From Swiss-Prot:
EC numbers: 2.3.1.-
Pfam families for the chain: TRAM_LAG1_CLN8
Protein location: Membrane
Region spans: Disordered: 370-395
Functional summary from the UniProt entry: Sphingosine N-acyltransferase-like protein; part of the gene cluster that mediates the biosynthesis of the host-selective toxins (HSTs) AAL-toxins, sphinganine-analog mycotoxins responsible for Alternaria stem canker on tomato by the tomato pathotype. ALT1 also selectively transfers methyl groups at the first and the third cycle of chain elongation for AAL toxin.
Organism expressing this protein natively: Alternaria alternata (Alternaria rot fungus)
Family indicated by similarity: Belongs to the sphingosine N-acyltransferase family.
This protein's name: Sphingosine N-acyltransferase-like protein ALT7
Membrane topology type: Multi-pass membrane protein
Additional note from the record: Gene clusters encoding host-selective toxins (HSTs) are localized on conditionally dispensable chromosomes (CDCs), also called supernumerary chromosomes, where they are present in multiple copies. The CDCs are not essential for saprophytic growth but controls host-selective pathogenicity.
Domain called TLC: residue spans: 123-366
């Protein structure tokens, strides 16, 4: 949604000094953040080490996983479809490793050279590469998701979304799409902790956790159809937001404002219109299409020898595909409320973000230009103020602005270096 400066490594849980050392590593630098005492904290050390070697670590691990799983697990030779099982967990883990490698490779070897070619300044290059990666990912998966949706029996049909429970088999494309989506959001939990902290860090982390739980449980509980619908609704919004940010970093402020307006419209329609319609269908359509009770996962028939209300278990039934493949699975009101609670939790987060978006929209209509309100301090490591960051971001390609900005930063860093040197000399004298 809203998103490592290749020069920025966040010091998790510690404050940073503006006079940090840097380590050259191929085409990019890794900054060694330190706390006020000048000592690198263990989380900071790990972040620096991981970022330096993330490509090698990811590719090495991925090769081992490829040797273990050369194809999607649980293929049925008779029907030509796939089912679920415990080996899917290893495939998901391999997906997390894969996205870690692809993210680093695309940012360093594709998007960073592209940013230089387009004249994006170094201070904005990290944000450009982050948003570029998100455009690539979300565009690919939104297109794939829409292809699956369009060619399904539930296209434009909410009744069809809930019918056929439990749908035990699925195509290879659907299974790969769903498991890789889960792997991506699990990887985003790691990414959000490696990026520089933003004002909505807690909301972002909560969003990634809820999304991952929803994807994992809907997959194991035979509800990939509704999951596909919701992913299609949210992914297109993420594409438009990241694309608008790219236009801003390229200095195309007017195009950025237009893209932002399109993004705002899509946000309102997809996330507060169609998304809530899917949630409402849990009350209106689900009880008739998918009545409470227990079902045979092979035939799909409702079993009369089990409780008519489906019992009161939640996790036991949700994880049935991994716990007892081929056995009966039950649906009850508690499971329905649990899924609805998670979906409503996401809606609350999206309403919080909507408030931030409307602030930006107000600026656009006032002629000030679109700027992410969450990022007013994201360049604070370079000493920029809110106004200075906005002006600089809108005029990234202006050489005069760049020279003035660099000169002012050099002056500040020289003064800080002198003050720190004086402070260290005083400490040495006190120690004697």
């Amino acid at each position: 949604m809203f998103r490592p400066d290749l020069d920025d490594i966040p010091a998790l849980g510690s404050e940073t000094s503006s006079l940090d050392n840097t380590v050259e590593n191929g085409n990019y630098r890794v900054k060694l953040w330190r706390d006020k005492s000048g000592i690198r904290s263990p989380p900071s050390t790990f972040c620096t080490w991981f970022k330096q070697y993330q490509i090698g670590l990811s590719l090495g691990s991925l090769l081992l996983l490829i040797l273990m799983f050369t194809c999607l697990p649980y293929y049925d030779n008779v029907s030509g479809t796939y089912t679920r099982g415990r080996d899917d967990l290893a495939f998901i883990f391999s997906g997390v490793v894969l996205f870690t490698a692809l993210r680093a490779i695309s940012m360093i070897y594709l998007l960073e050279p592209l940013a230089r070619l387009c004249g994006v300044h170094k201070k904005l290059m990290v944000r450009f590469t982050e948003q570029g990666w998100l455009v690539i990912h979300h565009s690919l998966f939104w297109t794939t998701g829409m292809y699956i949706n369009y060619n399904s029996e539930y296209w434009m049909d909410l009744d069809g979304v809930w019918s056929g429970f439990p749908e035990r088999t699925m195509t290879g494309l659907t299974k790969g799409y769903y498991l890789l989506q889960l792997a991506f959001w699990l990887q985003q939990i790691v990414v959000v902790n490696f990026e520089k902290r933003r004002k909505d860090y807690s909301q972002m982390l909560t969003h990634h956790l809820i999304t991952s739980v929803l994807l994992a449980t809907s997959y194991s509980y035979y509800q990939t159809k509704v999951g596909n619908v919701i992913l299609c609704l949210v992914d297109i919004v993420d594409v438009l937001f990241a694309f608008a940010k790219l236009l801003k970093y390229l200095g195309f402020q007017y195009a950025c404002d237009v893209a932002f307006c399109v993004f705002l419209a899509s946000w309102l329609v997809a996330r507060h219109g169609l998304y809530l319609l899917v949630c409402w269908s849990i009350f209106t359509i689900l009880p008739t299409v998918m009545p409470y009770g227990c079902y045979d996962t092979i035939s799909g028939n409702r079993l009369s020898e089990f409780p008519a209300d489906g019992g009161n278990e939640i996790m036991r039934e949700v994880l049935q595909a991994f716990r007892d493949p081929g056995g009966p699975v039950c649906f009850n009101s508690r499971i329905g409320w649990a899924f609805l609670g998670l979906l409503v939790g996401l809606q609350v987060l999206m309403l919080i973000w909507l408030g931030m978006i409307l602030k930006v929209a107000y600026k656009v209509f006032q002629g000030e230009g679109a700027d992410d309100t969450r990022s007013d301090s994201e360049e604070s490591g370079y000493g920029t103020s809110d106004h200075e960051g906005d002006c600089y971001g809108a005029q990234a390609g202006n050489p005069k602005v760049i020279r003035q900005f660099v000169a002012s930063r050099e002056k500040v860093h020289i003064e800080q270096a002198e003050n720190q040197g004086l402070h260290l000399r005083q400490q040495k004298r006190s120690a004697r």
